[in-house]
A protein has these predicted regions:
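Amphipathic alpha-helical segments
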Residues: 27, 34-35, 48-128
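Sec-dependent N-terminal signal peptides
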Residues: 4-14
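Positively charged n-region of N-terminal signal peptides that target proteins for export
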Residues: 1-5, 20
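Start-of-domain marker
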Residues: 44-46
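Sec/Tat signal peptide C-region and signal peptidase I cleavage site
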Residues: 15-19
Length: 160
């Protein structure tokens, strides 16, 4: 139940930030705006992870340095996703097959990058937490990613 409440909180708190991202035509977001949104969402994620995982001192000492690197790598992938979203928004009214194919291939590469990142970092999280706790972390991380992606997807119109 605690996890559910935390996830609902993340959605509620991130909704205004995400909703702003689709107002590209009305008021373009600056890089500084995007960075602030990312920092806010990351702080919320950190709190949810802390609350859900209830780390011991030794686990926290081993986990957070690895997670900091992992989160930075996630941010790099998120930046690529943002670039695709912006490209999509700029081309939605004039979308042709070639542009749709290009955007799809870029998103497939991003999805592959996310899975590769998770596989790469799993041994490090397992070393820090043990296999069972590392698996739990990945459950939490996956749920948080799904919530953010669902919110983004709900704000992006389908190709006409």
């Amino acid at each position: 139940m605690k996890m559910w409440n935390a996830l609902v909180l993340l959605v509620v708190l991130s909704t205004p930030a995400v909703a702003q991202t689709v107002e590209v035509k009305a008021k373009p977001l600056t890089d500084a705006d995007i960075q602030l949104i990312r920092q806010d969402v990351q702080a919320q994620k950190n709190q949810i992870i802390t609350d859900t995982m209830a780390f011991t001192e030794s686990e926290a000492a081993a986990f957070w340095p690895v997670y900091k690197e992992y989160a930075a790598a996630q941010q790099a992938i998120a930046a690529k996703r943002w670039n695709v979203i912006v490209d999509y928004a700029q081309n939605i009214d004039k979308m042709d097959d070639q542009k749709a194919k290009d955007l799809s291939q870029r998103m497939f590469a991003i999805d592959d990058g996310i899975q590769s990142l998770r596989k790469t970092y799993y041994p490090r999280f397992e070393k820090a937490l043990g296999a069972k706790r590392a698996a739990k972390f990945y459950q939490v991380d996956n749920r948080l990613s799904l919530i953010v992606n669902l919110q983004l997807s709900s704000e992006i119109p389908l190709i006409p």
